[in-house]
Amino acid sequence: MGSGDLNMKKSWHPQRSGNVAATQKAEAEAIAERKKLQQRLQEIEEERRKEEIQKALEAAGGKRKIDRVEWMYSGPTDGQAGDSAETEAYLLGKRRIDKLLQDNDTKKALSKQSQQDVLSAAGPAPVVTNARDVATKIREDPLLAIKRQEQQAYEAMMNDPIKRRQLLASMGIDDSQIAAKGGKEQRRHKHRSHHHRSDRHRDRDDDRDRDSARDRDRDRHSRRRRSDSRDRSRSRSPRRRSDSEEDRSKQRRRDSPDRTRRRDRDQSRSRGNRDRDDDRSRRHRFPQGRSRSRSGSPGGRSSRRREYSRERDSGGPSSRRDDRNSRDQNRPRRDYAKEDEQPKYDGGLNKGGRRQQQPDGDHKNAEEERAKKLAAMQAAATDLDKAREERLKALAEAERAEREADEKARQQNKKFRGGDAGFMSGLHSRAADMKIADRMNGRV
């Protein structure tokens, strides 16, 4: 047996490989910690120098630095600017609790005094005049963001009918009452606006009628005055006739072209309104043929005579009507006879969507033809029903006869052949009579 040191087998021996590795690891960690601490102390020293330089610049009249979020990184002084040595004591582990308890009152007094000194030295707070900074502060305001989220949630809930109904029910408000109230307000607003529009149209029509009546009276008075002056000029000398003509020319020159155009436009509009009302009332009162024949009555002739005299005096629509008639004469005529030879049924409606008026004879013929077609369709349907019933009866009779024959065959089999035993004996006898070729072919 060889000799050896038994202490090498102990777990506490420093030369064991495990203990050596643990020692090296602990030493490396201590060295890394000292390096980090030294680096942090250098950073603190650099920050302190920068602060001193900034304070010196501010004291010399330089630009003041605005503190925004620096208070978050000011250190373990509860938001107060304490001593730098006290700040570094946390890192070095040299800060003692007994000293803090003893100097608590003194620190409070010093902190209040330092706050007052800082406020008095700083003066008024700097005013932020940059619009971008103001917009950024408003956009990043947490309270504003919370309010905006609440508003969005409320709008989403009001847009959802189920949640809206639940909210109104919790508040004790009926949704149907709100909807009915809104519908009443909308109908009242529409009714009020309709009344306003009808009143405006009525006032405009009344003004137009008054203007047209005033123009008619002026035209009648001017015609009467011209006729009187013409009668007087016949009985007077040629000199007086020339004087009257000069007066009439002056009177005509006195009427401005704008007034003449306005009078012609009002007259044509009033005549169009009267003609349209007369045509509408005539269509409601009489058929198409009778209303067309009534236009040749003496009253119609007298009204046309009055309109012709008025148009001749005004000199407006007659020339336009002549031009329109000349254009209609030059336009090629449609051959309605060829169109009648090829009738097309459009459901009784013309291009305007109104039902065309047919003569009584054609209407009666169409009704008779429709009645004949309906009778033929009903007769064909009746014949089809009868044929179907007969076919169903024949099928039922055939099924009944087949059931009776089957029942009769069963009764005979039971009576003469003994039922199932007779059936099996018949099968055996038939199998015995079969040849081998029939058996090979599978015949029974």
Curated annotation (Swiss-Prot):
Region (Disordered): 1-27, 168-385, 397-425
Keyword tags: Coiled coil, mRNA processing, mRNA splicing, Nucleus, Spliceosome
UniProt key word Nucleus: yes
One CC-aspect GO term: U2-type spliceosomal complex
Basic residues: compositionally biased ranges: 186-199, 282-293
Record's compositionally biased regions (Basic and acidic residues): 200-220, 228-281, 305-344, 360-372, 397-410
The protein's assembly and partners: Associated with the spliceosome.
Sequence similarity: Belongs to the CWC25 family.
Function text: Involved in pre-mRNA splicing.
Protein name: Pre-mRNA-splicing factor cwc25
Protein species of origin: Neurospora crassa (strain ATCC 24698 / 74-OR23-1A / CBS 708.71 / DSM 1257 / FGSC 987)
